[in-house]
Amino acid sequence: MLKYSALFLYLIYVGGSESAHSRIVGGVPVAEEKVPYVVSIRMKEIHVCGGSILSESIVLTAAHCFDKSKGYSNYAVFAGSNRLSGGLKVEIQNITIHPKYIGPSDWWKNDLAVVKLKKPLNFSKSVRTVKIFPSYVPENETVYAYGWGKTIVPFFTLPNVLQKLETKALNLTACQKSWKEHVVESQLCLWTGHGTGVGLCKADSGGPVVYKGKLVGVISWVQVHCNTKKPDVAVRLSPYFENGLRKR
């Protein structure tokens, strides 16, 4: 059962925070031991989103990854592998959606979900937590996004091996030139540049955006059809953690 709870940010804190389609087109494969905190979230064994391990029983991902009409019993987390053909399946106890998340009509603001696992993960070299970066990423700094999203547009082709995208953090003013007021300070824009043909895509959603080895964002949405002419958008985690824990 999907849960909408005021305890949402507390759960994140004790852990360590068409439709929206978020691609890694033009990424490179990455070994599982390099990013042991990345998990695959699957519905009936089909990959739908990525996620990040915050504790032995908590995974952080995007709210839009879940269809509440299907119920949590059809979803599971797969950890410990960089391949969609592998991973240890862990059942989900509950899913807590950010209480202020609305969805497409609000441009996916607060697109965060906390997944609590039925059983704790057993940590190893391929299963580890990631810490949250506590402040803003400076403009034009290099960040990395990870996912199993579409790699070939327009075909629905998911890679078996986890992909890494090197991209840049774009400031809010520059991002709003593309997305206008739809993008706000609690969102993080990612930009690889015009004409690169590289970016995020469907099924990358929920995956981590990482800066200096720490989690700075959760992949949220991109331009429909994974058109790389506009910046990709993630949830920026730092506003949720300024001055310790702060509810938004």
From Swiss-Prot:
Can you supply one Gene Ontology CC term for this chain's record? extracellular region
In the UniProt record, the signal sequence range is 1-19
Q: Which Gene3D superfamilies match?
A: Trypsin-like serine proteases
Q: Does the keyword Nucleotidyltransferase apply?
A: no
UniProt domain Peptidase S1: residue ranges: 24-248
Q: Which InterPro entries match?
A: Peptidase_S1, Peptidase_S1_PA, Peptidase_S1_PA_chymotrypsin, Peptidase_S1A, Trypsin_dom, TRYPSIN_HIS
The family database entries (SMART domains) matched by this protein are listed as: Tryp_SPc (SM00020)
Q: Which cysteines are joined by disulfide bonds?
A: C49-C65, C175-C189, C201-C226
Query: Which CDD domains does the record match to this protein?
Result: Tryp_SPc (cd00190)
* One of the GO biological process terms: proteolysis
EC id: 3.4.21.-
* Location in or out of the cell: Secreted
Tell me the GO molecular function terms.
serine-type endopeptidase activity; toxin activity
Give expression by tissue. Answer: Expressed in salivary glands.
Task: Show the active-site residues.
Answer: H64 (charge relay system), D111 (charge relay system), S205 (charge relay system)
Could you list this entry's UniProt keywords, alphabetically sorted.
Blood coagulation cascade inhibiting toxin, Disulfide bond, Hemostasis impairing toxin, Hydrolase, Protease, Secreted, Serine protease, Signal, Toxin
Top EC class for this record:
hydrolase
Pfam families documented for this protein: Trypsin (PF00089)
Q: Give the family this protein belongs to, as stated in its UniProt record.
A: Belongs to the peptidase S1 family.
Q: What does this protein do?
A: Serine protease that inhibits blood coagulation in a dose-dependent manner. May act by destroying coagulant factors to inhibit blood coagulation.
User: What is this protein called in UniProt?
Assistant: Tabserin
Species, as recorded: Tabanus yao (Horsefly)
